[in-house]
From Swiss-Prot:
It comes from the Bacteria. GO terms for molecular function: rRNA binding; structural constituent of ribosome. One of the primary rRNA binding proteins, this protein initially binds near the 5'-end of the 23S rRNA. It is important during the early stages of 50S assembly. It makes multiple contacts with different domains of the 23S rRNA in the assembled 50S subunit and ribosome. Forms part of the polypeptide exit tunnel. NCBIfam families: rplD_bact. This is Large ribosomal subunit protein uL4. GO terms for biological process: translation. Belongs to the universal ribosomal protein uL4 family. Part of the 50S ribosomal subunit. InterPro entries: Ribosomal_uL4, Ribosomal_uL4-like, Ribosomal_uL4_dom_sf. The keyword rRNA-binding applies. The gene is rplD. SUPFAM superfamilies: Ribosomal protein L4.
Length: 208
């Protein structure tokens, strides 16, 4: 698949890049993408949820009332799970939600995600650019010129650029990632994937 390279004004530069079929034209594996995205979202969870059992709730050492003669069911503690203010039975406890995905499955998932975007015509290539100072306006103008201002856009960069990353941080629908660090979730959660030209080479080195 060939794509025209655009400049930040949205005009064609006359240059054409060829997408690697081993990355952008593979048979899409929905199961691999499912496994990877599920693991990514699970691994984001803190797992710090906690409720107290009857052993952990403060108080309740004294028997609420005598064993016999009241007509009520016998009770040994006011912190019993059936009492108001009592402990919780089988409540959530701190745990790890970490899920492991094999490296080959992760790579297949990323290739599948990129291939699905390529098939849908949702990949755009722009010439390499940099900013002299931190300003949101140039990045916002570039997205507008490319017709991506209203779309959830993933900008793939060849390397980390603090000026560009900080400039685009305040744009709600823009996600900026270094090409070899963008996850399957980042790709699938976007409506358009915007590659700097050099980022294509970076992704080929990673997934090729």
């Amino acid at each position: 698949m060939e794509l025209k390279v655009l400049n930040i004004q949205g005009a064609e530069t006359g240059e054409v890049v060829t997408l690697n079929d081993d990355i952008f034209a593979v048979e899409v594996s929905e199961h691999a993408m499912y496994l990877d995205v599920k693991a990514i979202l699970a691994n984001r969870r803190q797992g710090t949820h906690k409720t107290k059992t009857r052993a952990e709730v403060r108080g309740g050492g004294k028997k609420p009332y005598r064993q016999k003669g009241t007509g009520n069911a016998r009770q040994g503690s006011s912190r019993s799970p059936i009492m108001v203010g009592g402990g919780t039975i089988f409540g959530p406890q701190p745990r790890s939600y970490e899920q492991k995905v094999n490296r080959k499955v992760k790579q297949l998932a990323r290739r599948s995600a990129l291939s699905s975007k390529a098939a849908a015509g949702q990949i755009v290539v722009v010439e390499d650019f940099s900013l002299e100072s931190i300003k949101t306006r140039p990045v916002a103008d570039m997205l507008k010129n490319l017709g991506l201002a209203e779309k959830k856009t993933l900008l793939m960069m060849p390397h980390y650029d603090n000026v560009v990353s900080t400039s685009g941080r305040n744009i709600e629908k823009l996600n900026i990632q270094v090409a070899d660090q963008a996850s399957t979730y980042d790709i699938l959660n976007s409506q358009a994937v915007l590659f700097q030209k050099a980022a294509l080479q970076k992704i080929e080195e990673t997934l090729g």
